[in-house]
């Protein structure tokens, strides 16, 4: 299970939480964490910088344009050397047969080939690659005609009418194409001599509205209605989560964890990757790793502890005193950096000895 903070939207906010370790709860109500003061993104070394300081080159690829979430301002400050959006990816001019677009957006298969092209180019220059890719093929809208009514997997339902099922089939076809593209990517990496780890995750579930305005989740009885006010913590945790996969072209890279299952989250996946790769980390990321052991998700809507147990909030969670002290320490460190006198901010960017 991969716990998220949003349902149906919020990709840029989730990226900021994953790559930098901050959430909306760390700031005042209504604060957009993608549009903070520019220097806020330089208080701590971000996840990519844990790798670039060891000789990696960090690049971001996005299958759409650069208009969303202030990425062109914030991402360079998080350690990315280059940002490649749709037009930049197409300008790479790598060998490709077939169409570039699937439905309304760039095909995942084409996008992954671009990532392979960038990895090979970076490796050939003598560097290792930290690549962060954001695919788009299965993004909303889910209009029935999006994929020309194609659905490679048969699906039926006793709860949904044919018009609603046409929408569901669009999402299912997008998932199928993503799965096939991931298979092509891992097949290519099997043939690569470069030791490579792939982290593949869905940042949030789609809203997937049906013809009458209800979501598919309401129709299938997974929640009482579209308004989360009446949902239980268990319902929120279920629908505010997706799946994730960590794969490597050499099982030894997974440190004996190949084939295992482990709950993770938007804020826990970074520390999890750092642990797997044995990367030298700063005190800030060491703190986030410890926090992830007691807290997978903490938002205004719900809280999930380190075992995957949801609660309505941190106050209601069955946490030990030590766990609460750890959460308070994280809060204090961030407050000092963002609003205080930065008494310990520099020290938090020092490597763990």
Region locations from a protein language model:
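Solvent-exposed soluble domains appended to multi-pass membrane proteins
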Residues: 1-353
């Amino acid at each position: 299970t991969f716990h998220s903070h949003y349902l149906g939207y919020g990709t840029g906010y989730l990226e900021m939480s994953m790559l930098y370790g901050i959430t909306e709860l760390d700031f005042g109500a209504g604060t957009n964490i993608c549009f903070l003061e520019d220097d806020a993104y330089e208080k701590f070394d971000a996840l990519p910088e844990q790798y670039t300081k060891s000789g990696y080159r960090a690049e971001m690829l996005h299958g759409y344009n650069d208009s969303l979430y202030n990425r062109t301002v914030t991402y360079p400050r998080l350690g990315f050397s280059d940002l490649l959006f749709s037009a930049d990816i197409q300008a790479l001019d790598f060998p490709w047969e077939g169409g570039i677009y699937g439905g309304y957006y760039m095909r995942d298969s084409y996008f992954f080939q671009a990532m392979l092209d960038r990895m090979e180019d970076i490796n050939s220059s003598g560097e290792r690659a930290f690549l962060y890719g954001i695919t788009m093929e299965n993004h909303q809208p889910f209009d029935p005609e999006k994929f020309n009514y194609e659905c490679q997997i048969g699906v039926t339902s006793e709860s949904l009418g044919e018009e609603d099922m046409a929408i569901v089939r669009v999402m299912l076809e997008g998932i199928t194409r993503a799965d096939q593209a991931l298979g092509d990517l891992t097949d290519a990496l099997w043939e690569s001599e470069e030791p490579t780890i792939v982290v593949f995750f869905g940042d949030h579930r789609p809203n997937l509205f049906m013809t009458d305005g209800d979501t598919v989740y309401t129709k299938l009885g997974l929640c009482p209605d579209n308004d989360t006010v009446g949902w239980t913590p268990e319902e929120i945790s279920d629908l505010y989560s997706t799946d994730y996969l960590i794969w490597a072209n050499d099982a030894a890279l997974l440190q004996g964890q190949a084939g295992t299952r482990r709950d993770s989250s938007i804020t826990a996946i970074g520390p999890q990757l750092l642990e797997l790769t044995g990367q030298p980390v700063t005190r800030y990321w060491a703190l986030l790793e410890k926090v992830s052991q007691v807290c997978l998700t903490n938002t205004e809507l719900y809280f999930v502890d380190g075992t995957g147990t949801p609660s309505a909030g941190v106050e209601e969670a069955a946490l030990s005193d030590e766990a609460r002290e750890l959460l308070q320490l994280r809060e204090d460190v961030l407050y000092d950096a963002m609003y205080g006198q930065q008494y310990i901010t520099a020290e938090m960017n020092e490597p763990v000895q």
